[in-house]
Curated annotation (Swiss-Prot):
InterPro entries: Aminotrans_II_pyridoxalP_BS (IPR001917), Aminotransferase_I/II_large (IPR004839), AON_synthase_class-II (IPR050087), PyrdxlP-dep_Trfase (IPR015424), PyrdxlP-dep_Trfase_major (IPR015421), PyrdxlP-dep_Trfase_small (IPR015422). This is 8-amino-7-oxononanoate synthase. GO terms for biological process: biotin biosynthetic process. Homodimer. It is an enzyme of class 2 (transferase). Substrate binds at residues 27, 34, 139, 344. It comes from Methylobacterium nodulans (strain LMG 21967 / CNCM I-2342 / ORS 2060).
Length: 379
């Protein structure tokens, strides 16, 4: 190995890593190969995965794979540039039209990822002199977008309409514009936001609302439509990318002002084609979309947990090391359920985040519930 070029930098990194190790918070990459359905090979051994966000099992669906392959052969491996230069391949317009239609909006804009979408949307719409109110459990990328915006940002207690209303009543008058940020399905808790009620509040205070539907699209039924509906192509759609659905005027503005759209290479056309095929499958096969929630509710009923509201069910453990130990115990029994630790979740709330897929068999769900019961982790 060559000698370090920057000893002080390495010393800094090693000290930080030591602290992460001591707290049980160091992350490591573990090669994991999907082998079909909800099964995978991890560390050389087969497991049933309950940590994958491919909620509908479409990432390996023959029609989705075929659409990606056809686009790959026609357009090549990459888009070749920013979409505003040479990277706007025809499949993007098809995908955006389908997303907008499904969401009941005039237009849509596809980004490089859901994270990039939130990094671009909020700073393009809000800035100094504006007010942002965000659910305290909003995803990291929503918070990152607020910080980039420069707007005054205040969290409201999770799904607490009274607190949100009080903040609007107190703060809205001094702000030029107000933007409310929430998730339709919260990624770490699996519960749902009262979107219709939030929209009613927003209208009464002339505030705009952005709903992050990353974990809801294709899995939970439709509810009220927000003026700004964003999400990802990487979960139920089994592909990669992010999007915003909104009015034509807003989409045109974002096309010019969202820095994470303007200054980055467009998605590979194959990813867009795969997402488009997945959207069409969801519409053609509604029974597929109903399955993850049904399996999640089967699981919560077996363990006496609150009824699942989405395809995500948390099993709270508490401390990070305890969550890691439980995850290892499950993996020894053939189940991959990754421990979620701070800072992804608040300190003291480390958990197993269990994600259900249409690819799971009922017997696999029952076996996981039995394993958790035997380990004394739930119920």
């Amino acid at each position: 190995m060559p000698a370090s070029l920057t000893p002080s930098l390495d010393a800094f990194a090693e000290a930080k890593l030591a602290g992460l190790n001591a707290a049980g918070l160091r992350r490591r990459l573990v090669p994991t190969a999907r082998t079909g359905g909800a099964r995978a090979e991890r560390g050389g051994r087969p497991v049933v995965s309950f940590s994958c966000n491919d909620y509908l099992g479409l990432a390996t669906h023959p029609a989705v794979v075929a659409a990606a392959r056809a686009a790959l052969e026609r357009y090549g491996a990459g888009s070749g540039g920013s979409r505003l230069v040479t990277g706007d391949h025809p499949v993007f317009a098809e995908l955006e039209a389908e997303l907008a239609r499904r969401k009941g909006h005039e237009a849509a804009l596809v980004f490089g990822s859901g994270y990039l979408a939130n990094l671009g949307i909020t700073p393009a719409l809000a800035g100094a002199g504006d007010l942002i109110l965000i659910d305290e459990l909003g995803h990291s990328c929503m918070w990152a977008g607020t910080r980039l915006s420069g707007a005054r940002t205040l969290p409201f207690r999770h799904n607490d309409l009274k607190h949100l209303e009080a903040l609007l009543a107190r703060e809205r008058g001094e702000a030029r514009h107000a933007l409310i940020l929430t998730e339709r399905v919260f990624s770490m808790d699996g519960d749902r936001a009262p979107v219709a009620d939030i929209l009613d509040l927003a209208r009464s205070f002339d505030a705009w609302t952005l709903v992050d539907d990353a974990h809801g699209l294709g899995v939970v039924g439709p509810d009220a439509t927000a003026p700004l509906e964003m999400g990802t192509l990487s979960k139920a759609l089994g592909s990669y990318g992010g999007y915003l659905c909104a009015s034509r005027a807003v989409i045109d503005l974002l096309t010019s002002r969202a820095r994470s759209f303007v200054y980055t290479t467009g998605l590979p056309p194959a990813s867009a084609a795969a997402a488009l095929a997945a959207l069409r499958l969801i519409e053609a096969e509604p029974e597929r979309a109903a399955r993850p929630l049904a399996l999640a509710r089967r699981f919560t009923a077996r363990l006496g947990l609150p009824e699942a509201q989405s395809a995500v069910v948390p099993v709270l453990v508490g401390e990070a090391e305890a969550a890691l130990a439980l995850s290892r115990a499950l993996e020894a029994r053939g189940f991959l359920v990754v421990a979620i630790r701070p800072p992804t979740v608040p300190a003291g709330t480390a958990r197993l985040r269990i994600a259900f897929s249409a690819a799971h068999a009922e017997a696999e769900v029952d076996a996981l519930a039995q394993a958790l019961s035997e380990l004394g982790a739930a119920g």
